[in-house]
């Protein structure tokens, strides 16, 4: 549970300074006479203004606009043959916090913009916190973390004008064909969920599970909404952005207040460890899915959101999700995007919130002890008993590492140090899965809306070169799609 709020309303309460001293006035500064200057020793006025100047922390460089809630996850099935993780053992119920977000928009931007949605879950397990930091899409735009700053820059605002720019977005996308699968997903109905309650969530990356016998498996997570999938059209989303920029945030909070608790069923895809070496698709490529015909969904359990935060800043804005937070039985994979995020996320939290961000109640473990030798640093709150040494190893009985308990996971790799793309597998092209999404998964109405969404976006591109490259990009996804986009853009330009 979170901490007890301060300052409950009760008769006879009085205003104090931050150190508990009563103050003389909420309305008037201390001045030299009624019309004279404010004196510097009015400590309360100085404190009040100085605190106000420092209320904001840096917003997240991505996923700035968001909301969240508490709930629980209950494992209803037996997947112990695949993982020893305590939270995924049959019947175990685990407290959790989830944060939903858009990616590119600022903290005050409309949450109904067309954008992927963050789907980050913090499980407060008995073995420590496990953070599953995913999206509402099973894939992403790039497959190597070194390109992430460039990608995000292309989706943000122009440095000179401060405006978002279609040319910049399509220039990056069309020069990076690995983005085709995700852009097709984004430009379709799935890019505009009607509410956060009506969208699925995905771990997106490939992770490793380890069972009690030490057997290793590769795993992908799928959270299927129990509310059903519902989407906005572009016109509906635009209208809602003007009416209520916080529609998704408001809808989630009010649903929980009504007792209409949203829920998701968790499924996983399991790939035997050895399969990854010869599978026709690189199983660690974040721009690809694993076809369900090869690796079907296996039910794990149920996530329910049943409690709103008491304070948005303390519990949502300061919430810090890190892909590096694993628990025994769950580990990383050779996914180059995941490996980059394992570094970058906790680094961002240290900058944005502070060195000791993990000690904040929302980020600290709720069901497991913390035993380590870190100490000091800005805003340190917790500290070890004076009898505990500050170094390891020691002969004084302090905590010691336990490799068997930790179970960090592993994989084999060798070769020279190189800067190169993944080794290509037989089906590792950039367009075939996007083509399947268009040709097989979507129906006629969905394809029609996809063409409309793409053409509206590409039609706003000013550069002839970039626009033509965007047309070729969609030709590569599917010739029919490319042709329809060209025709729609031309028709809009001619006014027909």
List the model feature ranges, each with a label.
Residues 1-496:
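Active-site-adjacent core segments of small-molecule enzymes
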